[in-house]
UniProtKB/Swiss-Prot annotation:
It catalyses: a phosphatidylglycerol + a membrane-derived-oligosaccharide D-glucose = a 1,2-diacyl-sn-glycerol + a membrane-derived-oligosaccharide 6-(glycerophospho)-D-glucose. This is Phosphoglycerol transferase I. Disulfide bonds: none annotated. One of its GO terms (cellular component) is plasma membrane.
Length: 763
């Protein structure tokens, strides 16, 4: 209703000003600004819906000041460009309409009415309401009801009898199981759901709407609100350290806790969370690659669901035979947005909807088949009678190719339970949320019926039942939940552990690199993650007087304040204010002690602008002083004009990447010498080893042969044509996820370059 009202007010404002108000420069500017704000808000809402499927939420608020990099981001470039073009077109059209009758005399009353209508359209828009609520949630002191509803469970289960298998289905919400809406989409897993306790109204609350947040909510009974962006949790050393979560209780009760997934465990800090709360046995992409049958059978995120669930079954068999009490948690990935992935063992690899194939529905149909097969193996085993199986979605699906069809339905998360000890079949329509999952499981296992804000749906009352406005209530509790981190409010002394890549201050530990905004009674950590911008881009968003401490590789900050460190990959510490004084120090000891020293100086806006502009220089445009091209740092020597076909820097160097160009091209500012030696330190990837690799300068061509290990080769060139471009052509680029950023499309690797040096041989 508010959406229609806001649009009506917007159109009324445009029409009244365009046809009745006449022209006045100041009124025109004011009305265009307010109407433009309406447009920006609604396009932001549309874009947020596209990425999150949940409007403008906490993740969007974070992203407004940080670039979105990471999982599958290339698939969003075209929609993002379309949004920018649409915004420009709408602004141009709006300005043209408002100036249509510019020669008519100005009318104060109609101008005022148009402005009031424009302001009303902004106030009535859902986007403005969502942003306002989020901003309020950042500034509240907390909710007086929090102490009454937050309850710590007992640390043990009195007499545990049952093993636990808990399956998180990535984005596998209950909506997919509506056979009327999506016929025969989930026949195998749907049949199993109907055999157990099916909780049909599991809503999604703020702070539970992405994977690590859904896991925290389901095990600790609280949403993931933190003093930093949730997916950046990989940088912390402990996760809600004061909370008692399901894993803690299981471990204290004699359970061995296992977790198996196909993606990298470090992503979003899953390893930190699980290790902090009772899990001693973790298996992710790195751990599984030495044990799976086919290590090359992977998707963009890691191993396919059939591989992961096969390993989970092996672990279930092994643990059951041992007689040890255990819990086995697993997380699928094939249904990850925006498209999903199809395991090769599925019987149904395609699902048509609206008369055409739909990749997301196809991935759901395939993944549920894999999950059902895993469950049926357990049910057919002699150990099922001592086992509880839980299947839940980690969160509602984000914007995938099925999302518009899901939104036409009443959407709920999946949560059902299969008990081997006492089979029960029922559909329970009680109102609940993800935070109730862990408490319900704990209740079934014989423990308390509450964890944090979660309550057992079998014997307790969910906050979703108690409060009609449960979403607003949870946002009001956000400051209370953030305080559970026990995060320090000041930073004076700190220690950088060079060997462990950690920084410690005021009792807290963080993985490096790290950027901190330090103010009175608040320290705000800004870690670097797959979803956040590089730290220098985050620092560029700081105000001129914001105090910062930045710990990163020296070369990343050297171009600003210490050019002599431009080739150093050691750790450095920089601190100060972008508009004031800055310092940079080289971490030259294993345990390096530092102190914050912020000076209250006069702000220089020219210095501030220069620092911000330098921080925003993209990697490939950075230049440093050196007599060779060093590939394990960003940028290139000053002599290089441009380069292409080369991937990002890694600790050892850089790979060629045929996704960025079939050839490695390095163009210098001036012609290369008439005679020179080209000294190449490099290695080959896969099938490119021990094969001739053409290296060209102008019309001259030499052949390079590399091994899988790094070697140094010198090639002798004549350059009579004064060519300025060096070209290297990997013979057989291989599509692989080797060393890839989680969620990115595979790279096509050919050669790995450590250093290239041009040595003048004239005279």
């Amino acid at each position: 209703m508010s959406e229609l009202l806001s649009i009506a007010l917007f159109l009324a404002s445009v029409l009244i000003y365009a046809w009745k108000a006449g022209r006045n420069t100041w009124w025109f500017a004011a009305i265009l600004a307010v109407l433009g704000l309406f447009v920006v808000l609604n396009i932001t809402l549309y874009a947020s819906d596209y990425f999150t499927g949940d409007g403008i939420n906490d993740a969007v608020l974070y992203t407004l000041t940080n670039s979105l990099t990471g999982a599958g981001v290339s698939k969003y470039i075209l929609p993002g460009a379309g949004i920018v073009l649409a915004l420009a077109a709408v602004f141009s059209a709006l300005g043209w309409v408002l100036r249509r009758r510019r020669h008519h005399p100005h009318h104060f009353g109609y101008s005022l009415l148009a402005l009031l209508l424009a302001l009303g359209s902004v106030d009535a828009s859902p986007a403005f309401r969502q942003i306002s609520e989020l901003v309020k949630s950042q500034s509240r002191d907390g909710d007086p009801d929090f102490p009454a509803y937050y309850k710590e469970p007992s640390k043990t289960i009195p007499n545990p009898q049952l093993n636990l298998v808990y399956i998180y289905g990535e984005s596998l919400e209950r909506t997919y199981f509506d056979n009327d809406a999506f016929p025969d989409l989930t026949p195998e897993l749907g049949a199993l759901k109907n055999e157990g306790l099916d909780f049909s109204h599991t809503m999604q609350l703020p702070g539970t709407d992405y994977t690590i947040a859904g896991m925290v909510a389901s095990q600790c009974g609280i949403p993931l609100f933190a003093p930093f962006e949730g997916n950046a949790s990989a940088s912390v050393s402990s996760f809600f350290p004061q909370n008692i979560c399901l894993g803690d209780i299981l471990k204290n009760s004699g359970y061995q806790n296992y977790f198996v997934q196909g993606a990298n465990l470090r992503f979003a800090g899953k390893d930190v969370f699980l290790k902090s709360h009772g899990f001693d046995h973790l298996y992710g992409a790195e751990e599984l690659k030495t044990v799976v049958a086919d290590p090359s059978y992977r998707n963009d995120w890691g191993f396919y669901d059939d591989t992961v669930l096969d390993e989970a079954w092996k672990k279930f068999e092994e643990l059951s035979r041992s007689g040890q009490r255990f819990s086995l948690f697993t997380l699928t990935v094939d249904t990850h947005h925006p498209d999903g992935f199809i395991s090769r063992t599925c019987n149904r690899k395609r699902y048509d909807f609206d008369g055409k194939p739909n990749q997301s529905f196809s991935a759901v149909s395939c993944s549920q088949e894999n999950i059902a097969e895993f469950i049926n193996k357990i049910k057919a085993s002699p150990w099922f009678k001592n086992t509880v199986i839980v299947v839940s979605s980690d969160h509602l699906a984000m914007n995938n190719t099925a999302w518009k069809y899901l939104n036409k339905q009443d959407r709920n998360n999946l949560f059902f339970v299969l008990r081997g000890d006492q089979p029960q079949q029922d559909t329970l329509a009680v109102k609940r949320n993800t935070m109730d999952n862990g408490a319900t499981v704990l209740d079934i296992l014989g423990g308390d019926n509450f964890i944090g804000l979660g309550r057992s749906s079998l014997s307790g009352q969910s906050l979703s039942e108690v409060f009609l406005n449960s979403k607003e209530k949870i946002l009001a509790m956000k400051p209370d939940i953030i305080r559970l981190w026990n995060f320090p409010k000041e930073m004076k002394d700190f220690t950088v552990d060079r060997d462990k890549d950690m920084i410690a201050f005021s009792g807290s530990h963080f993985r490096l690199p790290l950027l901190l905004r330090v103010s009175d009674k608040r320290v705000e950590p800004l870690p670097e993650s797959e979803y956040s911008a590089p730290l220098r881009f985050q620092l560029a968003n700081f105000a001129p007087r914001d105090n910062f401490v930045w710990v990163d590789r020296c070369y990343k900050m050297a171009q600003l304040w210490a050019p002599e460190l431009a080739l150093s990959t050691d750790w450095c510490v920089s601190q100060g204010q972008l508009g004031g004084q800055q310092s940079i120090q080289h971490v030259d000891k294993a345990q390096w002690k530092g102190k914050t020293a912020f000076k209250d100086t006069v702000i220089d806006m020219e210095r501030y602008k220069g620092n911000v502009d330098t921080l925003k220089i993209v990697d490939n445009d950075i230049r440093y002083k050196a007599d060779s091209f060093i590939f394990n740092v960003a940028g290139a020597p000053e002599e290089v004009k441009q380069f292409s076909g080369i991937s990002r820097p890694e600790s050892w160097g850089r790979w060629s990447n045929a996704q960025l160009g079939d050839e490695v091209k390095i163009e210098y500012n001036t012609p290369l010498p008439k005679k020179f030696d080209l000294v190449i330190t490099a290695k080959a990837f896969g099938a490119n080893a021990n094969r001739p690799i053409p290296v060209r300068v102008g019309k001259e061509e030499q052949t390079l042969v590399l091994e899988n290990e790094v070697t140094t080769t010198t090639l002798h060139f004549d350059n009579p044509s004064n060519a300025s471009t060096l070209v290297i052509v990997p013979p057989d680029p291989v599509s692989t996820n080797e060393g890839n950023i989680l969620g990115h499309s595979p790279r096509k690797l050919g050669i790995g370059m450590v250093e290239i040096k041009v040595v003048n041989a004239e005279g």
